[in-house]
């Protein structure tokens, strides 16, 4: 019926959203819990004053350090995707046993990829990572 489209269209046996992983992206944007590849997860809670992100080991067999670095990447990704701005506090796991300086340096490196140029002052006295990101 449309010879100009012959060879340019193909039949997909599955729903296009499943093939292109749109459902998983949509779920990760709308849900408060985001699962990481390691089996760990992060929980994002927005309030009027600030956003709090909690890192949980979940079913991960990885070390605290590995989970925290994986979570750092996903946190910075979620901040961009959800356009979260303002004050953000991240509660990483086992910070008394993890190198907070290395994690802070890594977060600052990841922040360089963000067009809103978030500030990463570092860790609070209670071991929470502070992030200040411009609101969109």
What are these regions (language model features)?
Residues 38-136:
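Conserved glycine-centered short motifs in functionally critical loops
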Residues 1-49:
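Extended, charged alpha/beta regions that create polyanion-binding interfaces
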């Amino acid at each position: 019926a449309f010879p100009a489209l012959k060879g340019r269209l193909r039949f997909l046996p599955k729903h296009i959203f499943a093939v292109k992983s749109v459902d998983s992206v949509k779920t990760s944007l709308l849900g408060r819990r985001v699962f990481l590849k390691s089996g760990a997860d992060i929980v994002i809670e927005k309030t009027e004053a600030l956003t709090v992100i909690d890192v949980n080991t979940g079913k991960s067999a990885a070390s605290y350090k590995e989970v925290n670095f994986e979570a750092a990447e996903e946190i910075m990704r979620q901040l961009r995707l959800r356009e979260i701005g303002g004050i953000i506090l991240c509660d990483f796991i086992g910070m008394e046993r993890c190198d907070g300086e290395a994690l802070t340096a890594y977060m600052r490196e990841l922040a360089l990829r963000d067009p809103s140029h978030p500030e990463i002052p570092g860790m609070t006295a209670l071991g929470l990572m502070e992030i200040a990101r411009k609101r969109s």
